[in-house]
């Protein structure tokens, strides 16, 4: 086991060092880079993480805030609204439960992502479309974004409204997309007292409508969302949402979900505060019967981040959740993460994140904790390499603890 751990460490350090040494300056999302002729660092700290310029560019409908209400004087070019990205993945995992150890090695095409007709149209309207194909996954395709947006106002204060299907929220700093592959555990793990509640604060792209207001360094968003539906294949239940949601196996209550998201920029290179609140409802199966019960649930999270200096940026967050069991008893869940990231070169960073999540606070011995080390490197204009190692421990009392180790390397090319 020590020899395996040493081999893993050598491989990880070698790949991370190679990524850092090869990294070069790069350009941004190609369709926006082509349109504005700017480098990627104009909008990103370590992509996909945004700085304040990039965040406001997205909030203003893929235009600079001062361009709201002004039609572009440049000739229309369809290539300014089209991009594509392909992801390759290789990795190895090892899982240990008691004395049983299993390993897996895999190399594959992870995803093909298309961004057709994404950008600003005139001075007020914009659209965002993202279609992802998964060659070896089920379902084989997902429509992650498919919405139209309207902005009006001035550079300092503007309103927005969008409708369609979109990612759960647009965060900044600690609430933004991570610079590594995996997200914090509390964003991607459902609460679970005696059964899964299925909802995750990230991972389901729902349909809905959202209104927003940006003033200075603060933005507020309120959304009404379609929520999730429970599906059943054989004896297994799952949840889907969005454009390609499957037919519901249980009742639908006709009550939409509701979300509020607030961002405040403290520092232009990723320092900020964010608050997220989500209220939803979902029909969950009652074990041993063909019946369902309604789970009214809530999630509330606060995020904070700040660059202490040019060589260290800190991120952290805490989320609290409340759900119900089939006996209508309420239970809570909670999770947190802290992360330290070190900028190595422009657009290239290395980091370490600690995660903790308790899917049911009243229940003893079921916590999950993990440590994730990563390097996020960009080079040769549009090529990104992400190397990640994660060690995770899951308590399952009275069963033995489960320990998972995973190394993953992503090679991502965007055009």
Show where each model-derived region lies.
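Outer membrane beta-barrel
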Residues: 51-52, 82-92, 102-230, 254, ...
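Detector for outer-membrane/organellar transmembrane beta-barrel domains
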Residues: 253-255, 260-360
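Outer-membrane beta-barrel "beta-signal"
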Residues: 39, 377, 382-383, 403-415
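Outer-membrane beta-barrel pore domains and translocons
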Residues: 87-91, 132-134, 166-168, 223-227, ...
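The canonical Cys-X-X-Cys-His
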Residues: 37-47
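Outer-membrane beta-barrel proteins
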Residues: 72-75, 120-122, 149-154, 215-217, ...
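Surface-exposed strand-loop-strand hairpins of Gram-negative outer-membrane beta-barrel proteins
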Residues: 75-81, 90-111, 239, 243-248, ...
